[in-house]
Swiss-Prot record:
This is Sterol regulatory element-binding protein cleavage-activating protein. Belongs to the WD repeat SCAP family. Residues 640-1086 are annotated as: Interaction with sre1. Glycans are attached at N94, N168, N454. Changing K659E: In Scp1-M3; strongly reduced interaction with sre1.
């Protein structure tokens, strides 16, 4: 086996390398295979996160003194008297605040004071702490000296040289600055006196520790919720939410491959709400004891990000072939988009991190909230939304199977009007909603907060302290493994002190910046328990700990149950596949009840009905979906000579053609409906096509039966089927000047066509538009006159004809009679050429495909060649043809990225060559090729002499060798066959038996597989019989007197026909069949 790739003038062997399943593929496949279980698990986990945040909010509202306070905003100092605060300032120089001595002494003093407070019943509600930088401090020592009384570590420098040295060490705008550790206590009015007594007594008992550090008579100030956090005009926010819900719903309405539009819209809103509350819960658990974030805009920003991720996943899943199983489609879509979604998340987190250096603390807190929300939302998107989407696709496939006529495609009258505002769903808007929204709102918050503080727009100066505190907060868990107590940003709001400090420093403007305390990163759990023994804090701590532990236990139990019930892989544990998403190579024999070799096979267009005729002159019609026989005709019931067999597009009727008579049989209610004579030359071969006509209803149908003779004569019959019976009449007759090599039917959206390739090299296309058939000879390419035509193949829905020449293949648009593209291919053997297109769909009047594949036998080397033209990106597509806007063809939604549209020159070429096979058959999507070859039981392929010797014993040649032209019984033939078997057994003294194997190649997974075929009889077979594609992933190959259906992509064989093994579906189908049989039993007899 040799695999190589050609693309844009370069060879890339890595393109054909097998792609191993990633962790994301295993994860998504596991969820999509058991969606309801994971929906339950993630719902419980979300409830735990939401409930803990509601507990925090309820505790904050329960205490009236906290109902109007928020620690998220620390800059506003104008407030009403609701909460009394006491602030103690531990001041020092900008350099000393980072020294180990300063931090140790500050922490020791704070711990001692809190223990002292605990002895008196801890009369304060809580304490809030922050690091404060006050700048600028003038360069002159005389102006700074009055502030020195607030420093506890050391006095300020006594000479100007040291002042200049200090100024060089500063990090705040290049000026000298004064740093402080502020302890803010929020007290109830009745607790103020007690707090004063305890504070004075503590200071008097510790004269050597911070004797001059405090303002011994702290000013009573007020904390409040600034105007920015108060929600005015709720109806505007609710109206915006309703509008956003409508926009998202209409976006999903335009996705016709999604069934539950309202359900998925609600899922995204619920998922965003879960992320919002879970973020509040996480921040509350690790840091905050105040109310939850009061900004409604944060919720909508989370929704915008969910829209980005959801539509990225939806586009990938819709672009995957619909014939694959739902878990496989989810797996491929999630695996292809997880990297893009994760990179988008990283970009947003990096942007928020950079912005945090240039915004005020309240906006920093908002950035922190958004960052945490984005992470939680990303995790929920990859779990909860993934499971809900898999359920919805399953329901859509069930609905399409049960009643395709009741599809909701364009079912709403107002859907076409969305085309006028389609710019609202442009790819750029959908892909950048979250990015644009959070940038705009962060800028808005910075503008409003800076206006409140400075009176004008201003960015904060970059300060390294934010990075230091962030590092310590992360290191608290990852490195030091110490738990940060329930602390939030403090509040620096003593107007008296600020005014006094402003006068003493003679500074016109004081810029105040608050930061979380670095020193508190050294507080461990034991010290926290000893120090923070407030009733509110202890209760909050217990609730948060309980629900967080429950969160982890739920997830662990879910994984354990999943592993015990089904295992990590939902495939058969006895399977030889080692990876979870590696799909099955399946061979299923069809017991078609033939006793001799099968000569002819046929399948309906909907892959529902399969028919076969053998040397025993028996006809068997098989229902592939129900896996049962529908019609069996014995030799006595069949015509003496059978020239052709054909099934109608729906698989309900079968036509048989003898040398001068045609028969129409009903397959559903087995009976002969019609018998009619026709003209046919004695030695000519027939090719018969059913063309759809006018259908008034299920009780009156019209077809056109086109009979093509190899001599060049074409007859068109009009067939009408009613309840009372059927009628047929010859309506057209054509005669070509030379014999026909090959003829095909093309039932396109615009016309019914028959294309014929003659021995003279002409390609004549007969088209019916309206009541008249009109012929036309194709002559678009100048090479037509000089090169020999080898084969033709059509893509019906695209109205495209592929013409194989000596030097390549031409793709011709039959609608416009135009040459679209020429592919350079090696010489093709006659009647071995086939074409497949993957993921075909109609979008906005365009017929789009993801790839084009050619499979044929080389005319010189007799080797099977497979050419694939596509792109590694699963969202890329090619436009084969375009039509005017028509309701039955047009999908209003455009699920594809317009940037992913490729031209034929941009396609990558992948070539696969099978050296030890001479025949093959390709699936209709062009992604799988199958073949059958013979080898000995020892695994060695037979030699040419062995093949020639076996040709004498094959039943296929038995008719010519024994002279049984008019068979009247099976006995003489079977007796002769048993004698030949005995001779064969004596000839092969080694006792070797024939072994056949099926080989396949999967372009989608770059895999080559072989599997031995079980022999169900003792027939000696030289070559396999006819073969044809049965579905997008399945083919039928004849071997002797039985048919092997070969597929790749599912362990359950019925999955190849887009049927799911559901008990509910089986019950519905059985009920519908019984009703149909009762209806027909009274009108049509067998």
């Amino acid at each position: 086996m040799r695999i190589f790739t050609l693309g844009k003038g370069r060879i890339s062997r890595g393109y054909a390398r097998q792609v191993n399943p990633s962790l994301f593929a295993k994860y998504s496949y596991c969820i999509a295979n058991n969606p309801w279980y994971f929906i339950l698990v993630f719902t419980l986990l979300s409830i735990t996160g939401i409930y803990s945040s509601l507990v925090a909010y309820q505790q904050s509202l329960y205490d009236q003194s906290l109902a109007r306070w928020s620690a998220w905003y620390a800059e506003s100092i104008n407030a009403e008297a609701n909460v009394i605060t006491k602030q103690l300032y531990l001041l020092g120089t900008n350099t000393s605040v980072f020294s180990e001595d300063y931090l140790s002494n500050a922490y020791r003093w704070e711990t001692s004071f809190h223990q002292y407070l605990a002895e008196y019943g801890y009369p304060c509600i809580r304490d809030e702490k922050s690091c404060v930088t006050i700048s600028p401090i003038p360069k002159y020592y005389g102006k700074v000296d009055p502030v020195a009384q607030y420093s506890y570590t050391k006095g300020l420098p006594e000479n100007e040289r040291e002042v200049n040295k200090l100024r060089n060490d500063t990090i705040a705008e290049g000026f000298d600055s004064l740093s402080a550790f502020v302890i803010t206590y929020f007290l109830k009015p009745e607790q103020v006196d007690t707090f004063h007594v305890v504070l004075k007594k503590f200071i008097s008992e510790t004269p050597n520790l911070y004797a001059s550090l405090l303002d011994t008579s702290p000013t009573t100030v007020v904390a409040r919720i600034p105007d920015l956090t108060v929600i005015y005009r709720w109806y505007l926010w609710v109206g915006f939410g309703v509008g956003l819900f409508a926009y998202l719903y209409l976006s999903l309405v335009r996705l016709h491959d999604i069934r539950a539009k309202f359900g998925l819209t609600a899922t995204i809103f619920i998922q965003s709400g879960t992320a919002y509350f879970s973020t509040c819960s996480l921040l509350y658990f690790f840091e905050r004891t105040g109310p939850i974030c009061p900004w409604p805009m944060a919720y909508y920003i989370i929704i915008f990000m969910d829209i980005e991720n959801s539509f990225r996943l939806l586009r990938a899943v819709i672009a995957s072939p619909q014939t694959k199983r739902v878990p496989s489609r989810i797996m491929e879509g999630f695996s292809s988009t997880i990297i893009a979604s994760f990179s988008s998340l990283l970009k947003k987190l990096l942007t928020l991190f950079v912005l945090s250096f240039f915004v005020y603390p309240l906006v920093q807190e908002f950035c922190l909230f958004l960052a945490c929300s984005f992470v939680v939302s990303f995790l929920l998107h990859g779990s909860f939304f993934l499971a809900v989407l898999s359920v919805d696709i399953r329901r859509l496939e069930l609905q399409d199977f049960l009643d395709s006529n009741s599809s909701n495609r364009n079912s709403k009258w107002w859907v076409p009007y969305l085309e006028y505002v389609r710019f609202m769903w442009s790819p750029w808007i959908i892909d950048n909603l979250g990015t644009v929204s959070f940038h705009m709102y962060v800028i808005y918050l910075q503008l409003q907060s800076s206006t409140d503080i400075n009176g004008s727009w201003r960015l904060a100066s970059p300060n390294i302290r934010f990075l230091i505190t962030l590092y310590h907060r992360l290191g608290r868990i990852l490195r030091e493994r110490k738990l940060f107590p329930l602390i939030t940003t403090g509040w620096f709001g003593d107007p008296t002190f600020l005014e006094a400090l402003k006068e003493k420093t003679m500074a016109e403007n004081l810029v105040i910046a608050l930061y979380r305390p670095v020193i508190l990163d050294t507080v461990n759990r034991r010290d926290y328990t000893n120090v923070y023994n407030s009733f509110h804090d202890r209760r909050v701590w217990r609730w948060s700990t309980f629900f967080s532990i429950l969160f982890a236990i739920d997830f662990a139990v879910g994984l354990l149950v999943k592993a015990l019930l089904r295992g990590w892989s939902d495939h058969d544990e006895l399977s030889t596949d080692t990876t979870l998403h590696e799909e099955k190579f399946r061979i299923e024999p069809v017991p078609v009840h033939h006793q001799l070799d099968i000569l002819k096979i046929a399948v309906s267009e909907n892959y529902k009905t399969f028919a076969s005729v053998g040397l025993d002159r028996c006809l068997v019609v098989w229902d592939l979906r129900q896996w049962c026989t529908k019609l069996v005709l014995s030799k006595e019931q069949m015509p003496r000579t059978l020239k052709a067999i054909a099934l109608d597009p729906q698989g309900n009727y079968v036509s048989l053609f003898s040398k001068d008579t045609l028969f129409i049989l009903n397959v559903e209610s087995p009976c002969l409906m019609l018998q009619h004579s026709y003209h046919c030359k004695p030695n000519s071969k027939l090719n018969v096509f059913w063309m759809p006509g006018t259908h008034k209803d299920d009780e009156w149908k019209n077809f056109e039966l086109v009979v093509v003779e190899s001599s060049g004569e074409i007859q068109v019959f009009s067939l009408t089927i009613e309840i009372e019976g059927a009628d047929i009449a010859l309506v057209e007759k054509f005669q070509l000047s030379s014999p026909i090599i090959k003829s095909i039917s093309i039932v396109s959206p615009t016309a019914n066509r028959i294309a014929c390739l003659t021995e003279s090299g002409e390609v004549t296309v007969y088209s019916k538009k309206g009541p008249v058939w009109s012929p036309k000879i194709l002559s678009q390419n100048k090479n037509y006159l000089t090169e020999t035509k080898k084969d033709i193949y059509g893509i019906a829905m695209a109205d495209i004809l592929f013409l194989a020449r000596d030097s390549g293949v031409d793709m011709i648009d039959l609608k416009n009679d135009e040459l679209l593209h020429s592919f350079t291919l090696p010489p093709i053997k006659v009647n071995t050429f086939s074409v497949g297109v993957s993921n075909s769909r109609f979008v906005n009047g365009q017929f789009r495909v993801s790839s084009i594949s050619f499979c044929f036998t080389h005319a010189v080397t007799e080797k099977v060649l497979y050419y694939y033209y596509g792109n590694e990106c699963n969202e890329s597509y090619i436009i084969l043809n375009k039509w005017d806007q028509q309701p039955n063809l047009v999908d209003v939604h455009d699920p594809d990225n317009s940037l992913a549209c490729l031209t034929f020159d941009e396609l990558q070429e992948n070539i696969h060559e099978v050296e030890d096979a001479s025949e093959c058959v390709m699936s209709s999507d062009g992604l799988y090729i199958f073949g059958m070859r013979r080898k000995s039981s020892s695994g060695i392929c037979p030699t040419a002499d062995e093949k020639n010797e076996d040709n004498g014993f094959t039943l296929r040649n038995r008719k010519l060798r024994t002279g049984h032209y008019n068979w009247t019984s099976y006995v003489p033939l079977l007796d002769s066959y048993m004698q030949d078997m005995e001779h064969k057994k004596n000839t092969h003294s080694g006792g070797e038996t024939q072994v056949w194997e099926v080989w396949m190649y999967s372009q989608s997974e770059k895999k080559h597989r072989c599997k031995s075929l079980k022999m169900y009889n003792s027939l000696i077979i030289a070559d396999p019989g006819p073969s044809l594609a049965v579905s997008d992933r399945c083919v039928a190959i004849v071997l002797g007197n039985y048919v092997a259906l070969v597929g790749y992509g599912s362990e359950i064989f019925r999955d190849f026909y887009q049927i799911r093994n559901s008990d509910e579906m089986d019950r519905i189908l059985r009920r519908k069949r019984k009703n149909l049989q009762r209806k027909r039993s009274g009108t049509i007899g067998c």
